[in-house]
């Protein structure tokens, strides 16, 4: 049964500026080391950062809340399976929230076109 859905759209040019400025402290606050390594290895890293940020926002919207009760941006991580499909990996407070809500699966879809990155998250429970 679907528990919640969330969608977020991000202007990639915001992340273009952040990458150009080398705003490492902000990236370290928003992304896990694994996410930063993945994005930095891409030709247009700002696009990949924007997609991951949109996915984190979409997850919070699907849950019906924002960052609170000690949850951090690192608690929601975007990883790729062996075929390259994006998945959400939950840690800390996000994992506890998923357990408390009896979530059984998370689905994430990422896309980009021109200056925009979009993420859709669907949360399911039994």
Curated annotation (Swiss-Prot):
Q: Does the keyword Lipid biosynthesis apply?
A: yes
Whether Amino-acid biosynthesis counts among this entry's keywords is no
Pfam families in UniProt: ACPS (PF01648)
Cross-referenced InterPro entries? 4-PPantetheinyl_Trfase_dom, 4-PPantetheinyl_Trfase_dom_sf, ACPS, Ppantetheine-prot_Trfase_dom
Q: Where in the cell is it found?
A: Cytoplasm
Q: Which GO terms describe its biological process?
A: fatty acid biosynthetic process
Cofactor annotation: Mg(2+)
Q: Which GO terms describe its molecular function?
A: holo-[acyl-carrier-protein] synthase activity; magnesium ion binding
Instruction: State the UniProt keywords alphabetically.
Output: Cytoplasm, Fatty acid biosynthesis, Fatty acid metabolism, Lipid biosynthesis, Lipid metabolism, Magnesium, Metal-binding, Transferase
Q: Can you tell me which residues bind Mg(2+)? A: 8, 57
The primary site where this protein sits is cytoplasm
Gene Ontology cellular component annotations, sorted alphabetically: cytoplasm
Provide the catalytic activity annotation: apo-[ACP] + CoA = holo-[ACP] + adenosine 3',5'-bisphosphate + H(+)
EC numbers, comma separated: 2.7.8.7
What's the top EC group for this one?
transferase
Q: What does this protein do?
A: Transfers the 4'-phosphopantetheine moiety from coenzyme A to a Ser of acyl-carrier-protein.
Query: What family classification does the UniProt entry report for this protein?
Result: Belongs to the P-Pant transferase superfamily. AcpS family.
Q: What is this protein called?
A: Holo-[acyl-carrier-protein] synthase
Source organism: Geobacter sulfurreducens (strain ATCC 51573 / DSM 12127 / PCA)
UniProt lists the gene as: acpS
């Amino acid at each position: 049964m679907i528990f919640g859905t969330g969608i977020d759209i991000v202007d990639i040019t915001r992340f273009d500026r952040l990458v150009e400025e080398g705003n490492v402290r902000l990236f370290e606050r928003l992304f896990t080391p694994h996410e930063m390594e993945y994005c930095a290895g891409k030709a247009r890293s700002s696009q990949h950062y924007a997609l991951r940020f949109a996915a984190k926002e979409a997850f919070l919207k699907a849950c019906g809340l924002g960052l609170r009760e000690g949850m951090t941006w690192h608690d929601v991580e975007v990883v790729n399976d062996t075929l390259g499909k994006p998945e959400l990996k939950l840690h800390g407070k996000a994992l506890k929230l998923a357990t408390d809500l009896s979530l059984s699966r998370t689905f994430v879809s990422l896309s980009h076109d021109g200056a925009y990155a979009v993420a859709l998250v669907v949360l399911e429970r039994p």
